[in-house]
Structures are given as C-alpha cells and as structure tokens.
Amino acid sequence: MPAPSPTRQPATAARDWFLAPAGRAVLASEEALVVQALGDRPGLPWLWCGPAAGEDLAGDYGRGVRLVPAEAGWAGQLACALPLPLPSESFGAVVLQHVARPAGAFGPALLEEASRLLVPGGRLWLFVLNPLAPYRWRWRGSGITTSEPLVWRRRLRAVGLVPDPVSQGLGPNWSVRVSAQPQQGPGLRAAYLLRAEKRSVPLTPVRRRALQLAPAA
C-alpha cells in the first residue's frame, strides 16, 4: 500500500483506509457490537465517533450524536474540535471506533472527553486495530498507530475509567473478509474491543468529632 500523501492529515489518511476494502471488512466485522453499544443504556443518548463507512446504522438506534474524523477535528452532526460542545455526564455510551490515538488531537484529550461525557455507570466502547495481527500489513503506510490492550488500559485508568480485564478480538486474520464472531482476547484478529466503565466516586464519610463540653464555672 502506498504511503499517504504528505499533504494529508493523519486523521484523513486513516479515514481513507477505512473506506477501502480492507478497512471496510474490519468495520463490517464490528457492526453487531457497535449496535449493541448504541443500545447499551436504553433511555440515554449515545455518542459514536468513527469512520463514515457505517453511518447508516446511526439513525435506527435511539437518540445519539454521530461524529466522523475530519482535518480540523470532527464533522457529521456537529462540526467542531475538542472540547466537544456537549454537556457533561449526559451519555450512557460512548463509542470510539478507530479514532483514538496515543497522542495528538485524537490522543489523551479524546479519552478525557469520553470520561467527561459519560454518566456514572456509562461505558466507553473502544475499538482499535491490533498491532500483533498479520492484517497490520494491510494498514501499513496509512498513518494509523496502534497499541496493545495493556497500554490502552493504562490510558483509560489515567482518565478515571475502569477497563474490563479481557478484550475481544474481532475481524479477519489476514484475508479481506468479514469475520464478526468475537473471541476472548485479541489473538491475531485485525482489531479488538476494550470496554471501560465510569464509576461514581463514593463520598468520603466525614468523621464526627466528639462533643467537647466547656467546664462548669
């Protein structure tokens, strides 16, 4: 695969890869779990940030906001950059589908936004490519950077989220085909899903001081 043009931003180059057959096979393999995420907290809106190839799903699953990566930040139902113009603790689920990165505009600040927007008990659904998969040769030169689950768990904890101990492997191993059946652990699958929950912080009980009586006059 040819390297992306130097004039293209990394977000745009990665987005273009997911519009090609190899990327679309990964997205199609994740479709059932994205649908599950959108219905994870009935009655609460969701936020779905990801490549445009699957946007036709969004209108069928309750109230939500659909954003796609763009050169200047985000496009879709809103044209904006971080911080997102959305109220804190108002979303039951946040789906980050192949948009989170180790650094830059889609790095830690994006995870912090996800944590801010989730209600206590809400969940982040993080879909990322697997750096150990043979399929990585298909995104070579696209500008996509990937990390193993252990690294992502550290990043999620750093923004106050509690990640699941086990991720789910998704997508093909090497052939460009849809492979939707998840497996425990990423293995050699093209991508994996890591979920993390926002826990409510318990109030620290205040120790009552013993009543001090003044001595009688």
Locations of the language-model features?
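Class I SAM-dependent methyltransferase Rossmann-like catalytic core
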Residues: 1-40
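Class I SAM-dependent methyltransferase SAM/SAH-binding core
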Residues: 32, 36-84
